[in-house]
């Protein structure tokens, strides 16, 4: 064998399912790969994270001759990363990385197990990084879009008569629509926001907007996220304070 994997590590631990889009847009794995041959060598590098992938993520690179280099690799997750049966649960998993290549016409494979990683369920976040809440603003979701557009259209005459079609008027209509829809506030018994928002080590659970519209009951962060998402859907920018 002329290729070996000296080391490999994921840049994030724990791994938040809610941040899957962010992960896909930045380097996710760092791998040090050695090629002891005298020739450059095309290889396929793949790695797999249980519960988050149906198939390994694969990238093709060319190793320089007599090289011992570190490579930053991207990632792509399964389309059901938020909807699979395992998506609601926390999992301790052991990712692995493989390098496939040909040596003298023969298929060769170098592989290595990575350090175990915690994959947190789809609703988990930490308030140590408040910007994480942005990943729950699914403004283009069909359920969100239907709720926002249907209510704005249903009260278009009220909007025109009393609010002059202003953003404030549209915001009031959506706020009132959420009440008429039957949403109920209920403090999260396991992770009440006021108790854990300043605890940088605690994990909170937030519902996606489509989940709250289905459940009709949620904590303050669930309700604020849904309302902000609806406002963004109709073009009103919001900020979480």
Residue ranges and their predicted role:
Residues 106-140:
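Short beta-strand elements
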Residues 31-37:
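Asparagine-centered strand-capping/turn motif at beta-strand->loop junctions
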Residues 134-215:
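Secondary-structure boundary elements
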Residues 1-30:
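Beta-sheet-dominated interaction scaffolds and their linkers
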Residues 83-104:
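Short, aromatic- and glycine-rich surface loops/edge beta-strands on solvent-exposed regions
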């Amino acid at each position: 064998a002329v290729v070996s994997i000296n080391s490999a590590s994921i840049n994030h631990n724990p791994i938040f399912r809610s941040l899957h889009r962010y992960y896909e847009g930045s380097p996710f794995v760092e791998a040090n790969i050695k090629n002891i041959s005298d020739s450059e060598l095309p290889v396929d590098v793949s790695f797999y994270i249980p519960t988050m992938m149906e198939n390994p993520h694969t990238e093709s690179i060319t190793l320089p001759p007599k090289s011992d280099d570190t490579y930053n690799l991207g990632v792509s997750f399964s389309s059901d990363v938020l909807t699979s049966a395992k998506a609601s649960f926390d999992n301790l998993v052991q990712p692995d990385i493989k390098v496939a290549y040909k040596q003298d016409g023969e298929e060769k494979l170098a592989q290595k197990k990575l350090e175990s990683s915690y994959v947190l369920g789809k609703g988990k976040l930490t308030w140590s990084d408040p910007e994480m809440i942005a990943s729950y603003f699914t403004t283009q979701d069909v359920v969100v879009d239907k709720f926002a557009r249907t209510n704005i259209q249903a009260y278009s005459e009220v909007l025109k008569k009393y609010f002059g079609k202003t953003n404030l008027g549209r915001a009031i209509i959506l706020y009132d629509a959420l009440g008429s829809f039957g949403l109920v506030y209920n403090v999260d018994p396991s992770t009440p926001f006021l108790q854990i928002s300043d605890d940088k080590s605690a994990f909170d659970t937030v519902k996606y907007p489509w989940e709250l519209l289905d459940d009709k009951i949620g904590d303050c962060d669930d309700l604020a996220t849904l309302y902000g998402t609806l406002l963004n859907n109709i073009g009103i920018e919001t900020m979480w304070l």
